[in-house]
Amino acid sequence: MRLDRISITNMRLVGEDTREININPAKNVLILLGDNGFGKTTVLDAIATAMAPYPAQFPGIADYQLSDLDVHINRRGRRSKYLTIDAEFSDNGVSMTSVRYRKGTLNTPKPNYEQLKQAAIAKKEAIIAEESNIELPIFAYYGTGRGQFQVPERRRGFQQTFERWDCYKSAINPETDFKRFFGWFDMMEDQERRDRERLWDITYKSPVLQAVRNALGIIVKDYINPRIETRPLRFIMDRIDKDGSRHELRIEQLSEGYKIVIAMVADLAARMAEANPEMENPLNTSGIVLIDEVDLHLHPRWQREILIQLTEVFPNLQFIVSTHSPVIVVGGAEIAQVVNLNTINDDENSHQNDIQISNVGQVLLSDLFGLEYLYSPEWDDKIQERDTILAKPELTVEDNTRLAELDEELKGLTSLPNSNAIRSSQLIEKLAKQLNIEL
């Protein structure tokens, strides 16, 4: 299951000029860029709304609905006629559309997600009939609040039994429900202990739990052996120090970056194992995962690697992420399609895959981020003064003296690239490619 196209009209800051993204089928990662207020989260919410009818066909799974506040209000303060989300999905070569609306000043047309709905119903009926080899796709949405979670203090209220489709519970809610994962992991550890006793094999490990452990082990390399202890109730892992010794830590004791990644990866792997427990490797489950601000609380070194890590651990998932970080773009250069929402409706193509993005400075100075220079803003006035003097038709003695002073002060900046140089380089590369010339 993957998203192939999404278009949005009259949603929040997106007005009557439809915003449409056609997704490259050769890429498993879509990176959304844009200034604050240009609709990165809006696009993610729209995708969540479009795909929600699929999990909503299963028992106990709520639909994901937008509110009246999501309908666009124009500059005159008038609400639009209605909000429209139009998406196209594909699953094993079968194309499915999902068109959803939200009422504004007029009644909406009838929504159309029958293909998506029927595909889900067919899966549900096959599971109930206990047919074999039925794979449930995964849908998940991790918002910016995913770092604010609480570990339950007691086992009270834990779910005792899990159906395969329970993998969809709270999945499209952008707030991470760590308690749900906690309850599932606790139950599976109990089952693993009972299976060890039944099999008379103290080395036995649950394949389902191993999927979660393996996912965490690959992405969070310095931490191993995730487990739940009951007195007091806590989720802990062992940190491997540089000297090889182990140090037990509760998840609450970890940095925000580690907490966010561990909670997200554990939740995602658990949902995959829950959805497809009979798969040889549940981490090969297909599906769509949305992550808002994927760089949240991550050190630049980890930002550079996180997309590669996620696609290696979950090879059949489609990740659609937003970011403000050029390091994320550099790290995902080979595997991701990059869409700049600032220019998506411009004549120029906003899909920047043909741009050579070999370093962070180049990305910052490209049209993806729009910085003019990499130096501190404190130099702007001096550069402006120099440019003003140079623009004069004739220079006085005082002008030449001041230019010499400015050149001395600015000489350390002359080696830094600027946006014009980057654009010139990109244009040369583009022309060379068109003319089949090797540079």
Per-segment meaning from a language model:
Residues S170-N284:
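Extended helical coiled-coil dimerization/tether regions that scaffold
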Residues A140-G143, N225-T230, I236, V321, ...:
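A structural signal for short, well-ordered beta-strand segments and their strand-loop junctions
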Residues M1-R180, E385, S415-L439:
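P-loop NTPase switch/coupling surface
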Residues A50, W184-Q191, R271, K382-K392:
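Solvent-exposed, amphipathic alpha-helical segments
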Residues M1-I61, I236-E378:
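Switch/communication elements of ASCE P-loop NTPase nucleotide-binding domains
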Residues A46, Y141, A211-I219, Q309, ...:
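Amphipathic alpha-helical segments that form well-ordered structural scaffolds
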Residues R76-I85, T230-R234, A333-I335:
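A short, compositionally biased
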Residues A129, I308, E312, V327-L439:
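RecA-like P-loop NTPase motor core
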